[in-house]
Amino acid sequence: MAVAVAAAGVLMGSEPGPAEELAKLEYLSLVSKVCTELDNHLGINDKDLAEFVISLAEKNTTFDTFKASLVKNGAEFTDSLISNLLRLIQTMRPPAKPSTSKDPVVKPKTEKEKLRELFPVLCQPDNPSARTMLDEEDVKVAVDVLKELEALMPSAAGQEKQRDPEHRDRTKKKKRSRSRDRDRDRDRDRDRDRDRDRDRDKDRERDRDRERDRERDRERDHKRRHRSRSRSHSRTRERTKGKSRYRSRSRSQSPFKDRKDREKYGERNLDRWRDKHVDRPPPEEPAIGDIYNGKVTSIMQFGCFVQLEGLRKRWEGLVHISELRREGRVANVADVVSKGQRVKVKVLSFTGTKTSLSMKDVDQETGEDLNPNRRRNLVGETNEETSMRNPDRPTHLSLVSAPEVEDDSLERKRLTRISDPEKWEIKQMIAANVLSKEEFPDFDEETGILPKVDDEEDEDLEIELVEEEPPFLRGHTKQSMDMSPIKIVKNPDGSLSQAAMMQSALAKERRELKQAQREAEMDSIPMGLNKHWVDPLPDAEGRQIAANMRGIGMMPNDIPEWKKHAFGGNKASYGKKTQMSILEQRESLPIYKLKEQLVQAVHDNQILIVIGETGSGKTTQITQYLAEAGYTSRGKIGCTQPRRVAAMSVAKRVSEEFGCCLGQEVGYTIRFEDCTSPETVIKYMTDGMLLRECLIDPDLTQYAIIMLDEAHERTIHTDVLFGLLKKTVQKRQDMKLIVTSATLDAVKFSQYFYEAPIFTIPGRTYPVEILYTKEPETDYLDASLITVMQIHLTEPPGDILVFLTGQEEIDTACEILYERMKSLGPDVPELIILPVYSALPSEMQTRIFDPAPPGSRKVVIATNIAETSLTIDGIYYVVDPGFVKQKVYNSKTGIDQLVVTPISQAQAKQRAGRAGRTGPGKCYRLYTERAYRDEMLTTNVPEIQRTNLASTVLSLKAMGINDLLSFDFMDAPPMETLITAMEQLYTLGALDDEGLLTRLGRRMAEFPLEPMLCKMLIMSVHLGCSEEMLTIVSMLSVQNVFYRPKDKQALADQKKAKFHQTEGDHLTLLAVYNSWKNNKFSNPWCYENFIQARSLRRAQDIRKQMLGIMDRHKLDVVSCGKSTVRVQKAICSGFFRNAAKKDPQEGYRTLIDQQVVYIHPSSALFNRQPEWVVYHELVLTTKEYMREVTTIDPRWLVEFAPAFFKVSDPTKLSKQKKQQRLEPLYNRYEEPNAWRISRAFRRR
């Protein structure tokens, strides 16, 4: 109103034109908005100050200059406030009118400026100090604690130091040297301290008991000495003591309140104290004797219920009418408190979830404890009860803030409840006016009869998604704006897309047919034979019959015949055979002739783009040439690979050529495995590992040359490395960057890297004839097999290469092709069928390099791995159906899915080129020329534009890169994907309300895991189950723990069932690892129980590395013992997005999108079907199956993900119930829909 009046006054006085009036109104609106921002952040609402800030922003249009001018004028604004003010002023300030012309010249905004206005959260200023912020905070906390310790030294020592100034100076010097020694020796002492933890914990318990006795004696002496003092003076002293205790509890920076705490922790354990207390979330349960703020939620005749604040979960307690106030008896509770009133209460006791509180012992104004003796008695009784309840509990668990969840369920079961018949009787008596409603046990004066708190687990709890957007994303999420899906297909209605959908349907039909055949075979087994199999002492005849019948359909001859024929049985030899020495092999590579030119090009240019076909020797030779040229004298030579198998195999080969042991001068680093040493000069690694090194050392100071190999694959890590290394080479002029690619799209790389020169390695290429189909093919798998048979029967000698999408498709094609060739008879020339996919053992993959025997032909059926990663000699014919399986992010479900999509034109050219390596060849494209031209993208969509970016955004934020819009991506990811990633990180607690990284987020970025696994592992530290969670995370990181051979499926299932846990699959994996550990990591034990020994050993290595990371960050590894509820809570805290509830009709429904899913048949919970579960991942076979499932309590979802879930309003119908269909009970006399009202009217 004031703004409007002021504006009106300005307009009346000067009588300007309409445009000027509008401009003044806009200016007044801007001033008001700036005043509001200043008031919100600083508590200053000054119009003159707002106008001064606006004038500064008009003169300084960039963030840096604006910030500098504010600092120069004495302003102490945060970066986020400065950014918001500048954006606000530049958006709302009316444009100045030029004096020379009537119409202002508006400069068109660039695309990036429009995006900055539309998504301000993605262009926050970078924070280069974010990498070291965590360490600085740790040091600051340690310094504050040391100051506290020094301030709490006895006063006598202080007086003595005052008398002796020289002694004080000497002490200061000693302190400085002692602090330096402490910093220097802390790492060395940490291992020694960990070994002494158990003994020290026992000593602490003894010291605690002695200290308690001493304190009682001191109190007795204190009373005896001061008995003569006046009562008013003692009351004042007690009040002061209570105030200081209350203040110290609310202050997070005062760790040691008295001498007992100082003796308990000591100086050497300051770091441990910091991580346990400063990093720890609010406690889950109230502590007896402590004082809490609370709010009155309901009023009863016998007292009131108060909800406690400052706890991790919702916790209510009862203040009995006798505990309301000290003065006199209370007749009516409503006279003392009212609903919604803020009060201060002391916790007297709690049993299960029933908590007894007191208001009369607390000063409601200051929070002072008016009866501290009662507090000591309560705590003493609790300690005695706890020690008597569980004497075998490890003492070191007392240092961890973990709830006693194992006792909750037991205590809750002991509570006496009113049975249903008793409730019915009471209701009938109320209806007959024998009892009044007020006497009903569950009566509430304001809301009427409600269910009791104790009946929570019996009632059907409804959980809903929180519809509120994160504060920094308001107006930008999918709730408030339509997000366009990622476009990975050029024409969704074209013939290629239709063929992909048709093939998916056919594959599903084939799977269902095989499953039906297996079920029919199992059903053919007569009933009642299982008792002979299970009986430990059966008669011989019955046992034999049972064994024979159980083996039906599972005999060794059930293994596909084509596999026996393809791999040649036990006599097969693996590996590419050659008669040349290693030196001759190196000299035969195409790159050898260009060795000198290549080294010179690297010397002359800081960035070099190298183009060469697969097999030219780029990966193995360039690093050796540069090492021989002396570049290793300045640092290491690093080479990245997109796949971990490639990094390992290439490093092994280069070490053989280099003449050293693997891990010495030549080594490799992959996730969870480091095979390097201080002598390593050539280091191969996955691109993700180099990205993690950038997190620690952004300038990569230990490297002289970085080589990004296979850059054409454009993995998500490679694209991020492009932007990071582009900055690094500008800072480090002595560093060299080499980017290699097997495709011919080098111009794009060159333009991105400052017009870097291109070095081309000429390869052996021959002309390739390309043939298209006349009509689109609906079943490309069948068309591929027909084409292979036609080539084999009609074309001249030469091997065939077929491209398919995945393992299942390849196995099916091999089986069908083998049967068809077998049906042609023995007169047809032999066709050797060889599959290639990543899950196949590497020694079997190498069989494709063996030449076919005379008079026969081999056909290699492979995934897109054969496009660029493999070079197979002798290929003259290529069959290209035109499809590939890609990982695509589904924004609806929030997960990545493998989807069959058409290839790009660049991939089609690459596949055709495979036929021209040995001689002139042919490429059979099983799609039309029009489809190639109109339905295929020019290049394939980079992974960064079609996958989930939560992990990438977390890494960039940890590096201090907050301005994601200004980050130099080669192909920028969609804004919608970045917004979704930040929303996910916010719900995990990794981002705060301003979109900046939290302390938890920095911890998460330190682990080489997915964000959900990181959250799960870090929360397990606070829940006191990190020992178990380390094992579970390690087991989840490996694949195929259980082995199920087709000839012993029943026995394998029986052995696996021994490890099944009622809580779910995560704890089943934990049981497997612990059993292996208890059997001394035995390989025979693995074979006996059908468990992959190699997978368990890999899990063991992963666990060791994760343990090292936790130790480095001082995160305690604590076991929860038999309290598996803690493990379930930790799993729920990380994977709450993957929660599902049992559906009344079929399977389960996910909470996030109501998708129908099912528990996988191999799960430990398959036959249990619990009400609520969380899953690790979804797998699409015949149905959408949940893998690695664990049961949960729905209340945990609200407890650990309050930003994502909430309890639905019980007075309204939830969304989930609205979607449910009403199914009437079966009635043989009526049709199913006869109960509907519409049918009743129709009958009339």
UniProtKB/Swiss-Prot annotation:
Residues 599-762 form the Helicase ATP-binding domain. GO terms for cellular component: cytosol; nuclear body; nucleus; U2-type catalytic step 2 spliceosome. Its main location: nucleus. InterPro entries: DEAD-box_helicase_OB_fold, DEAD/DEAH_box_helicase_dom, DHX8/Prp22_DEXHc, DHX8_GH2-like, DNA/RNA_helicase_DEAH_CS, HA2_WH, Helicase-assoc_dom, Helicase_ATP-bd. Residues 170-179, 221-234 have a biased composition (Basic residues). One of its GO terms (molecular function) is RNA helicase activity. CDD domains: DEXHc_DHX8, GH2-like_DHX8, S1_DHX8_helicase, SF2_C_RHA. Residues 289-360 form the S1 motif domain. Residues 152-289, 361-396 are annotated as: Disordered. It is an enzyme of class 3 (hydrolase). It is found in: Nucleus. There is a cross-link at residues 140, 423 (Glycyl lysine isopeptide (Lys-Gly) (interchain with G-Cter in SUMO2)). PANTHER family: ATP-DEPENDENT RNA HELICASE, ATP-DEPENDENT RNA HELICASE DHX8. Involved in pre-mRNA splicing as component of the spliceosome. Facilitates nuclear export of spliced mRNA by releasing the RNA from the spliceosome. Identified in the spliceosome C complex. Interacts with ARRB2; the interaction is detected in the nucleus upon OR1D2 stimulation. Interacts with SRRM2. Interacts with CACTIN. This is ATP-dependent RNA helicase DHX8. It comes from Mus musculus (Mouse). The lineage of its organism: Eukaryota, Metazoa, Chordata, Craniata, Vertebrata.
